[in-house]
């Protein structure tokens, strides 16, 4: 690992203490943390009074590490600093996708009209039964529309829904354009986003703690403290903004689940968007199949009409020919 480090050993910790991000990447810093000397190793090296150049490269490196108070803690802070911007950016992007998807779904008038049509169809099919006057339906019922078939077994309720909408509300057929963030949101796991938010908060706490302790280290940590204070000034503001977005996402997710009449404690966000994404795909597929079936029927009708016209032209000719004879 040491052979991959571009910075000379005697400058390595100076780069770390100066928080020079270009000196090392995250993997290299993590490997350095593994190299941190144990108490036993430190005691052995402290007792060495010979020439440092006669030691192996690893031993020389351990002696460099020993010069820095709480070197492991500082390396972890350095690692956090290197990853901070990308971590915050990635989490912000993921949260924004969840937020946008939640708002798009709730604000889609087209999707709402489709849901109303599904309810009307369900009540019509169940007319005369206890289910014939329902005021709503469970979200997972959307996925059962492909299971209910007509007597000829060719058309499903999903096909019929698309046909009704095509006849009565054709403008809603492209509702999927209203929910552009549905598919990327379906790839998100809120549990992992929560863990990432927690990791960033804990990492920042460690930075604050190390800064407070390092201020008593003396000259060796002066640059480290100066750079860390500057980093904290912007990092704390970034994390506050991120935490605010995270809270907003939590509220929007709950509102989305309640919008469909479900319980946030029992129906997680992942289930909602997964169900809606599958419904969208099945809906689009059924609509496309309807379109192809209609084209096929129109083609057959046209061919039938063509044959009829041709036969009508042939028949008089045959009669006239017979009269001549």
For every predicted segment, state its role:
Residues 1-293, 300:
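Folded alpha-helical bundle/alpha-solenoid domain cores of large eukaryotic adaptor/scaffold proteins
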């Amino acid at each position: 690992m040491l052979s991959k480090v571009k910075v000379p050993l005697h400058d390595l910790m100076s780069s770390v203490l100066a928080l020079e991000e270009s000196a090392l990447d995250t993997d290299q810093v993590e490997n350095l943390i593994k190299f941190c000397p144990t108490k036993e190793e430190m005691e052995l090296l402290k007792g060495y009074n010979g020439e440092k150049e006669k030691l192996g490269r690893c031993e020389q490196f351990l002696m460099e590490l020993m010069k820095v108070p709480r070197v492991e803690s500082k390396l972890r802070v350095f690692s956090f600093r290197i990853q901070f911007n990308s971590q915050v950016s990635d989490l912000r992007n993921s949260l924004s996708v969840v937020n946008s998807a939640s708002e798009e779904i709730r604000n889609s008038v087209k999707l709402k009209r489709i849901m109303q049509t599904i309810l009307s169809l369900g009540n019509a099919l169940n007319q005369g039964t206890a289910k014939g006057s329902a005021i709503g339906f469970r979200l997972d019922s959307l996925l059962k529309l492909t299971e209910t078939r007509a007597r000829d077994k060719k058309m499903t309720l999903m096909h019929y829904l698309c046909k009704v909408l095509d006849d009565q509300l054709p403008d809603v057929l492209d509702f999927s354009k209203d929910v552009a963030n549905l598919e990327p949101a379906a790839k998100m796991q809120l549990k992992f986003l929560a863990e990432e938010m927690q990791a960033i908060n804990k990492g920042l706490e460690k930075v604050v703690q190390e800064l407070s302790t390092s201020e008593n280290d003396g000259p060796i940590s002066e640059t480290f403290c100066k750079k860390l204070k500057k980093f904290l000034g912007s990092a704390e503001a970034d994390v506050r903004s991120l935490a605010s977005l995270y809270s907003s996402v939590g509220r929007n997710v709950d509102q989305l689940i309640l919008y469909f009449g479900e319980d946030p404690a029992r129906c997680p966000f992942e289930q909602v968007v997964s169900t809606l994404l599958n419904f969208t795909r099945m809906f689009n597929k059924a609509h496309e199949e309807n379109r192809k079936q209609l084209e096929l029927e129109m083609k057959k009708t046209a061919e039938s009409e063509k044959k009829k016209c041709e036969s009508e032209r042939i028949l008089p000719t045959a009669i006239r020919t017979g009269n001549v004879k």
